[in-house]
Amino acid sequence: MEDIVIATNNQGKINDFKAIFKNQHVIGISELIEDFDVEETGATFEENARLKSEAAAHALNKRVIADDSGLEVFALNGEPGVYSARYAGLGKNDEDNIEKLLTNLEDVQDRRAQFVCVISMSAPNEKTKTFKGTVSGVITTERHGKNGFGYDPIFFVPELNKTMAEITNDEKGKISHRGNAIRLLKEYLEGEQHV
């Protein structure tokens, strides 16, 4: 099987793919193209993932995988959604984003939410395929745990009775939105080999 090229410079995302594609060579796009960047102008996770994978597949003339992910809070009509990384504004960090979300949920009873990841796979002269993974949870009123990043310290998973920041990387890989989407992609690729 060919190398798995991921259109990201985020080492954490690359590691998530490597954890599931253990027997294959997974590389980030920066190993093939310097300064690859695509503006995420899509209104959905799928649109943003497609923008990245299609641009990278065109630039490299080979199959490329990209993803877009974020947090959707039901009581906030899906916010922060595609703006999860920049919810508090450009130049702000994870703490600023968490603070804004907690403020927006201050008097809200329904704190149900989900992390969403859409993986897009594009190749020259092939239809782009997408794979969606989710994990459901509840937004806490305060931070718990030190692992992970982003909204993990306030995303409580009832089945585990912990936030995403309180579980190990191995546990997270088994239940996370990105892990779920990567497993769907892997099943598809394994099926492709048997055709």
From Swiss-Prot:
Enumerate the active-site residues.
68
Binding residues for substrate: 8-13, 69, 149-152, 172, 177-178
The record's Gene3D superfamilies line, in alphabetical order, gives: 3.90.950.10
Q: Does the keyword Metal-binding apply?
A: yes
Q: Which reaction does it catalyse?
A: XTP + H2O = XMP + diphosphate + H(+); dITP + H2O = dIMP + diphosphate + H(+); ITP + H2O = IMP + diphosphate + H(+)
Q: Name one GO molecular function term.
A: metal ion binding
Q: Which GO terms describe its biological process?
A: nucleotide metabolic process; purine nucleoside triphosphate catabolic process
* Cellular component terms per the entry's GO annotation: cytosol
Provide this UniProt record's keywords sorted from A to Z.
Hydrolase, Magnesium, Metal-binding, Nucleotide metabolism, Nucleotide-binding
- Residues noted as binding Mg(2+) in the record, renumbered to the chain: 39, 68
Report the EC number(s), separated by commas if there are several.
Answer: 3.6.1.66
Cite the cofactor comment: Binds 1 Mg(2+) ion per subunit.
Q: Which residues cross the membrane?
A: none
Q: How does it assemble?
A: Homodimer.
Homology family: Belongs to the HAM1 NTPase family.
- Report the protein's function: Pyrophosphatase that catalyzes the hydrolysis of nucleoside triphosphates to their monophosphate derivatives, with a high preference for the non-canonical purine nucleotides XTP (xanthosine triphosphate), dITP (deoxyinosine triphosphate) and ITP. Seems to function as a house-cleaning enzyme that removes non-canonical purine nucleotides from the nucleotide pool, thus preventing their incorporation into DNA/RNA and avoiding chromosomal lesions.
This protein's name: dITP/XTP pyrophosphatase
Organism expressing this protein natively: Staphylococcus epidermidis (strain ATCC 12228 / FDA PCI 1200)
Q: What is the lineage of its organism?
A: Bacteria, Bacillati, Bacillota, Bacilli, Bacillales
